[in-house]
């Protein structure tokens, strides 16, 4: 482990310009690296794609953009041949140039479609929006670790989705909102969109859960950003199951008016199966879901795949579930290997509301989910590790349940703010947070003794991440370890196997997920999840969450004093390297911060004393501290098991100074700057702090000494923390900049203009030539309304760090073409050495 003084943590970016400049300097080093094209390998898909007779015709009728790209490629190839360069060298050079351009190119996003479709149909816009800091939610370059890269697919294969075909015998009843069908045993049905599922007869499987007949209705989200869930009949009455699917209106589709990342992810125009079941409905009828037989049924021609389980995955889930309440499993593996998918399937399987299982065990204590992946968490926004207690299965990707606040299907027991998407910047704090969450799980067992535990470990599995993983395997008292890759590498599998052997627990190795391409990168999914987090609400009157399309700039903020007699914010901490107090205002304004409840005035880890985790705290007289404590004592030694006397942990003692005495007031704004440490800021002690959620600092009112915070944290949750005597500290970490919040007003203005154009076109169609006086009066007001909407767009586009391109230049066309590209996952991106710099 590194010492505190030796950690080279990057400070939080002072501005978007500084972040962009730093990234440009890093991008200049890319050409010197060797392309890793030889390291790419993919695992075979679970099922081979079946080519249909219509595919050839579809390819011939495709748009001409692919043909143009082919001619450009052939022209470049001829020029390279004339220059005397061999094909192999030219291929490597081209691959290197593409990677360099994608790393240094500013992100762009298209935004308009000329077709005036219905309110629920997906749409594009023609403008390209650029974020000047190169870290926007619409960034097209790969993630920082380089395990995703944009690729162009010549044509989409026609992939089979549903085995069931709807007809008069299988459709029981249908209307504009509802569809009730029969599914025969071993047959399945795939839907695209979001809907409520009710199992009336038989037993069906969905995303690992076995759903039996009951009065319970399950909300299902099936966007095109992920593999589509499959509804399969596994047992039926007279060989058939009966399900009812109903449209739901949660408002999540409205987020497409605020971000292009939410466009083209739900169902498009009605498919042939939809039209069959909507014969008696009006021509304009459209549900929030569509039945798909094959991927070619999609009107938007997207890359759609069903979510099928590998046989090894099914066997492992069945074996793990037989441990019932004694299950304590850690799921780890490389990035993009399917850890989250497997965890979600196992979670849903354990939470299946079956009357009883083969072992006569019925889960009434729920399932504990310990999420140690701060980059792609399942039930919280990025930058957090947490322990959740769940009582019902969840059907949808993480951005459909970014928070459990106010929900009836689960709750967050405790969470800690890591302040980054990777724990490698401060592994000591990460391990202490994991140990505290594990202690909370042991306390949870007192009330729910048969509650199993699922631990989701991040893809940080090499180098120091492997050291942390092996230490957790030895320390957490697990029952199983699952590694999500059959291709090694040996330098990872062997230490994990040795740690599992020493802990006397089995290690199961499973193949990684069969998905090779995704339509959203991990950075884009993080932006979608945190944007969903800030727009989601959980009314107490209903069981399902709702999403509001009100932009962040128009949302009602929390106004809190940071100075004076009514001070509500005790301190502001900036994780990473120390900054000048004069820069705190610039670092904080417009940033995402963690709202942390400090449960003790001695919540800063100073490293002044130490103790083994399994022993009680030593009093001051027996402390090993002699006033000159080494920095090594503040770190967590992970070379030995938990019973080793060399295992130490930093903690606070009554002799630790109060963090109130460590606050420095800034000269101009009087902000309470909290910093403790030498070179880098010591984080809050996980045993004495709890993260309530995230907030966006919308403005800092210096004259009145107030902060405007936009946060979805329920007011009751903050009030309870204050009533218990906890102080509120804002922690500014190194999370992605909220560029999505900067562009929301622009996209909302464009959506309003498009909605007005659609209403005008519909009015003209309904009234003919506008014969009546009301129509004439409305037509006279149309120029005024259109001018107001255009002025709104103009004002919304004048935002710092954002540029709108509205021309039809080559740069615009190339950006629009890149938006149609997919992201290829690098599954065999294993290092040749143990150095993390290879990644």
UniProtKB/Swiss-Prot annotation:
What is the species listed in this Swiss-Prot or TrEMBL entry? Aspergillus clavatus (strain ATCC 1007 / CBS 513.65 / DSM 816 / NCTC 3887 / NRRL 1 / QM 1276 / 107)
Give a GO biological-process term: rRNA processing
Low complexity composition bias: residue spans? 10-28
What job does this protein perform?
Polynucleotide 5'-kinase involved in rRNA processing.
Give residue spans, biased composition: Acidic residues.
Answer: 120-131
| Compositionally biased region (Basic and acidic residues) | 76-90
E.C. no: 2.7.1.-
Protein name as annotated: Polynucleotide 5'-hydroxyl-kinase grc3
UniProt record similarity statement? Belongs to the Clp1 family. NOL9/GRC3 subfamily.
- Alphabetically ordered keywords of this record: ATP-binding, Kinase, Nucleotide-binding, Nucleus, rRNA processing, Transferase
Which residue ranges have biased composition labelled Polar residues?
Answer: 644-658
Cellular component, GO annotation: nucleolus
Q: Which gene encodes it?
A: grc3
Which Pfam family, any one, appears in the UniProt record? CLP1_P
Instruction: Please give the residue ranges the record annotates as the region Disordered.
Output: 1-131, 605-658, 758-784, 807-839
Name its cellular compartments: Nucleus, Nucleolus
Q: Which residues bind ATP?
A: 333-340
Record-linked PANTHER family: CLEAVAGE/POLYADENYLATION FACTOR IA SUBUNIT CLP1P, POLYNUCLEOTIDE 5'-HYDROXYL-KINASE NOL9
**InterPro entries attached here?**
Clp1/Grc3, CLP1_P, P-loop_NTPase
Supply one GO molecular-function term. ATP binding
**What highest taxon heads this organism's lineage?**
Eukaryota
């Amino acid at each position: 482990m590194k010492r505190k003084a030796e950690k080279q943590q990057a400070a939080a970016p002072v501005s978007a310009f500084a972040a962009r400049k730093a990234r440009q300097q890093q991008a200049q080093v890319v050409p010197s690296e060797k392309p890793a094209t030889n390291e790419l390998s993919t695992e075979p898909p679970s099922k081979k794609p079946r080519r249909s007779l219509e595919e050839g015709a579809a390819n011939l009728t495709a748009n001409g953009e692919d043909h143009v790209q082919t001619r450009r490629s052939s022209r470049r190839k001829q020029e390279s041949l004339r220059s005397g360069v061999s094909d192999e060298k030219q291929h490597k050079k081209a691959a290197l140039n593409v990677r360099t351009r994608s790393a240094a190119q500013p992100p762009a996003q298209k935004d308009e479609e000329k077709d005036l479709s219905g309110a629920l149909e997906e749409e594009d816009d023609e403008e390209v929006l650029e974020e000047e800091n190169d870290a926007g939610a619409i960034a097209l370059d790969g993630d920082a670790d380089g395990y995703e890269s944009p690729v162009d697919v010549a044509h989409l294969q026609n992939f089979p989705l549903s085995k069931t075909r709807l007809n008069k015998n299988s459709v029981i009843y249908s209307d504009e909102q509802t569809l009730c069908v029969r599914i025969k045993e071993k047959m399945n049905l795939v839907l695209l969109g979001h809907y409520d599922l009710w199992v009336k007869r038989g037993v069906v499987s969905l995303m690992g859960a076995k759903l039996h007949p009951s009065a319970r209705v399950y909300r299902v989200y099936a966007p095109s950003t992920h593999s589509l869930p499959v509804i399969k009949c596994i047992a039926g009455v007279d060989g058939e199951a009966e399900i009812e699917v109903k449209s739901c209106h949660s408002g999540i589709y409205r987020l497409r008016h605020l971000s292009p990342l939410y466009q083209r992810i739900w169902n498009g125009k009605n498919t042939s199966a939809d039209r069959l079941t909507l014969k008696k409905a009006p021509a304009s009828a459209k549900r929030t879901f569509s039945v798909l037989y094959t991927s070619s049924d999609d009107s938007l021609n997207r890359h759609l795949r069903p979510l099928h389980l590998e046989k090894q995955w099914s066997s492992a889930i069945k074996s793990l579930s037989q441990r019932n309440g004694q299950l304590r499993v850690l799921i780890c593996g490389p990035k993009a290997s399917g850890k989250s998918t497997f965890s979600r399937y196992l979670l849903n399987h354990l939470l299946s509301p079956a009357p009883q299982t083969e072992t006569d065990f019925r889960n009434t204590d729920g399932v504990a989910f310990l999420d140690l992946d701060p980059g792609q968490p399942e039930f919280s926004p990025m930058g957090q590790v947490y322990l959740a207690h769940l009582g019902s299965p969840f059907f949808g990707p993480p951005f459909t349940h970014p928070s459990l606040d106010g929900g009836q299907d689960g709750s967050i027991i405790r969470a800690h703010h890591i302040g980054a998407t990777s724990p490698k910047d401060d592994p000591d704090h990460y391990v202490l947070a994991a140990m505290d969450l594990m202690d909370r799980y042991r306390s949870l067992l007192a009330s729910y003794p048969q509650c199993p535990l699922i631990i989701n470990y991040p893809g940080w599995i090499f180098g120091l991440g492997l050291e942390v993983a092996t230490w957790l395997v030895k320390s957490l008292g697990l029952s199983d370890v699952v590694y999500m890759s059959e291709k090694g590498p040996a330098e990872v599998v062997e230490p994990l196997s040795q740690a599992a052997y020493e802990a006397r627990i089995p290690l199961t190795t499973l193949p990684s997920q069969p998905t090779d391409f995704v339509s959203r990168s991990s950075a884009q999914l993080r932006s979608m999840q945190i944007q969903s987090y800030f727009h989601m609400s959980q009314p107490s009157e209903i069981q399902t969450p709702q999403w509001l399309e009100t932009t962040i700039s128009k949302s009602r903020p929390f106004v809190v004093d940071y100075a004076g007699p009514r001070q509500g914010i005790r301190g502001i901490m900036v994780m990473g390297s120390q900054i000048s107090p004069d820069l705190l205002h610039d670092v904080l304004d417009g940033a995402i911060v963690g709202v942390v409840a400090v449960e003790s005035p001695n919540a800063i880890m100073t490293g002044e004393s130490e103790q083994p985790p399994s022993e009680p705290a030593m009093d001051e007289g027996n402390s090993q501290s002699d006033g000159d404590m080494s920095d090594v004592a503040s770190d967590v030694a992970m070379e030995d098991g938990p019973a080793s006397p060399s295992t130490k942990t930093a903690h606070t003692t009554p002799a630790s100074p109060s963090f109130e005495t460590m606050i420095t007031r800034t000269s101009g704004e009087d902000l309470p700057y909290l910093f403790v440490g030498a070179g880098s800021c010591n984080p809050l002690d996980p045993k004495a702090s709890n993260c309530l959620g995230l907030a966006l600092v919308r403005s800092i009112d210096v004259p009145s000494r107030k902060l405007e915070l936009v946060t979805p944290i329920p007011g009751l949750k903050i009030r309870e923390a204050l009533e218990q005597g906890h102080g509120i500290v804002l922690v500014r970490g190194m999370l992605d900049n909220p560029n999505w919040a900067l562009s929301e007003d622009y996209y909302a203005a464009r959506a309003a203009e498009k909605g007005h154009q659609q209403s005008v076109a519909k009015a003209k169609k309904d009234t003919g030539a506008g014969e009546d006086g009301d129509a004439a009066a409305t037509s006279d007001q149309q120029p005024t309304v259109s001018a107001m909407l255009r002025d709104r767009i103009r004002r919304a586009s004048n935002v710092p760090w954002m540029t709108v391109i509205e021309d039809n230049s080559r740069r615009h066309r190339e950006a629009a073409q890149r938006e149609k590209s997919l992201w290829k996952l690098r599954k065999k991106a294993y290092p040749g050495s143990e150095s993390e710099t290879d990644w």
